[in-house]
Amino acid sequence: MQARLLIPILFSVFILSACGTLTGIPSHGGGKRFAVEQELVAASARAAVKDMDLQALHGRKVALYIATMGDQGSGSLTGGRYSIDALIRGEYINSPAVRTDYTYPRYETTAETTSGGLTGLTTSLSTLNAPALSRTQSDGSGSKSSLGLNIGGMGDYRNETLTTNPRDTAFLSHLVQTVFFLRGIDVVSPANADTDVFINIDVFGTIRNRTEMHLYNAETLKAQTKLEYFAVDRTNKKLLIKPKTNAFEAAYKENYALWMGPYKVSKGIKPTEGLMVDFSDIRPYGNHTGNSAPSVEADNNHEGYGYSNEAVRQHRQGQP
């Protein structure tokens, strides 16, 4: 009775292997972000900005300078997600015995010769090279069986890197301004500010992982935001906030069994490891702070190099 119940269960498991719900990770559909990815990217950015310690800026007028690493791109993952034929790969062939009989035609040749009163008679028997009859007989039955495991592997990932998405940069800027406003800190134009706050967004992207085992499978999408910030008093050029790093990771995970499911979907956010290199240990030469704070606003002649206006002016005038 148990054996009869076990057979249809095993049959159903093998038939339903690789059947489930596919969620585009990281994206399917012409490069457009889908809702889960948007949620993760926004969550990691919100957490990183919300965790900024801004107490030293209370009562000050702040000018914000935000620089973002290029993050926009597109990618596709092909292959992977194995299907089970069986747990092993092999083949067994049982071939029947085959016997073939050939019948070759034979012909007789007689030659008579006479010379000087003597007569000779020669008789020869020859066999043709081509058979006149062929008969093939097979004894026994033949069979062929095979077992196998077809694995698509981890898949092939192809990506394309583009420039920074201006909408992502604007979104980050709005998040920062929102947090400053809710903390009671005034964000003003650079001309009216007494404090400069610099925020460098080093990491702002997604990570996709796939786990493939015989019984357990998982799809994971992670979004990370890592930033470093500091604040400078314009009057005395002192650091109100020394360089600090915030790093958060939001994750979405689908769990499968034999690629059936997902039977469990989980989401979460947590702090992650910081930047590989930060500026928290940098000190000014001779315990002296420069006359001008770094600037991320570049004119047409030095665009993209991050020089301050004072440094550019000195360079043009030939000053050291």
Swiss-Prot record:
A lipid is attached at residue 19 (S-diacylglycerol cysteine). One of its GO terms (cellular component) is cell outer membrane. It comes from the Bacteria. Disulfide bonds: none annotated. The keyword Lipoprotein applies. It is found in: Cell outer membrane. Residues 288-320 are annotated as: Disordered. Belongs to the MafA family. This is Adhesin MafA 3. It comes from Neisseria meningitidis serogroup C (strain 053442).
